[in-house]
Amino acid sequence: MKTLFQIRPARFSDIPAMQCLFRETVLAVNRQHYTAEEVADWASWGDVRRQWEGWFARQHYFVAESPEAGMTGFASIDETGYMHALFVHREWQRCGVASALYETVERFAREAGAGRITSEVSETARGFFERQGFRVDGKQRQQANRLWLKNYKMSKRLDCPELDVK
């Protein structure tokens, strides 16, 4: 059982490993809800390093890493509570990595004074986010590179969660 990992703030030097993890995860894990053409288009969205550098300028990134496996996942959030990313390596799915990363970004959002966390969530990740207390605010189509993919606008209130009626 894979359980040994730690969470730390990401560094610019992590970008190549994050790009690789992103691509491999999308191609392997998201095939259950998206076509091969859709996942290929989505995976290519993270190929440009300059784009990642821009995301780093606007978001706070955290990585999960294991002594034996290296990077096992990453997540990002900004001060307003917008969570741009949460990806876990395909071999570390259902090992607690996503939950630990989510707890880290939620703690960051609370400390930043955000009243809610919002995200655009894939069909594949929707169940995980619902288990964290998120609700679907709407269904949408989001452009990856060439293609428009189905996903969900989701949110979780941090200030008064009891008001978040499903």
Annotate each PLM feature.
Residues 58, 82, 115, 148-150:
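Exposed loop/turn and edge beta-strand positions of beta-sandwich/beta-sheet ligand-binding modules
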Residues 96:
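Conserved G/P- and acidic residue-centered "switch" motifs that form tight phosphate/ATP-binding loops
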Residues 1-16, 159-166:
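Conserved N-terminal entry element of GNAT/NAT acetyltransferase domains
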Residues 125-126, 145:
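Short secondary-structure capping/turn micro-motifs that flank functional sites
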Residues 118-120, 135-153:
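Conserved catalytic-core motifs of GNAT/GCN5-like acyltransferases
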Residues 9-12, 20-93, 102-104, 108, ...:
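Acetyl-CoA-dependent GNAT
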Residues 129-130, 134:
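Conserved active-site tyrosine of GNAT-family acetyltransferases
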Residues 109-121:
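Conserved GNAT acetyl-CoA-binding A-motif
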